[in-house]
Amino acid sequence: YPSGQLILSYRAKQSLEIASLTKIMTCYLIIKLAEELKRNIFDETFDVKEYVEYSTGTTAELIHGDCYTIEQLLYALMLPSGNDAAMSLADWAGGLLNANSDHRENIKVFVKEMNTRCKQLGLKDTRFGNPHGLPHKDTRSTAYDISVLCTKCLDIPLFCRIISTKEYRTTIKTTDNL
């Protein structure tokens, strides 16, 4: 609602598993971190690592060795709900925050930042355990908190452009010179 005023709610504060709604925070945080760290997501690239090919659930079918811009990975995150893209983005951003090359550590750092942002945004009943939303004991939220997060996201032009895209095609670079 444009005024931000709550009109009607039903169990808005009931804590639930949120599955792929987690990717809304992942997308939000990647865009915000890139802005804060002065990174150009249209030019900055990430080489998909081997572990990403073993992602479960829905994926964007990213392939080890392919090179994507961060913008392309955001589309891969949001359009097909790509768990592989979520892991790649978390690895990239966690590496920026942590200056580490270990993907497991980078992803942990990113998830920790997701939870820090929850506090900053006033999402009192939200907690994340991973960047993609696959079942995890720590990943929970409420309809109210998700609505607050979505309202913040709708103020970001790139987020709006991504979620309103019906079809996205891109050219990828490979790192194996083929």
Regions found by a protein language model. Give the residues of each.
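Extracytoplasmic
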Residues: 145, 150-178
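Active-site-adjacent loops and short helices of periplasmic peptidoglycan-processing enzymes
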Residues: 1-144, 148, 153-154
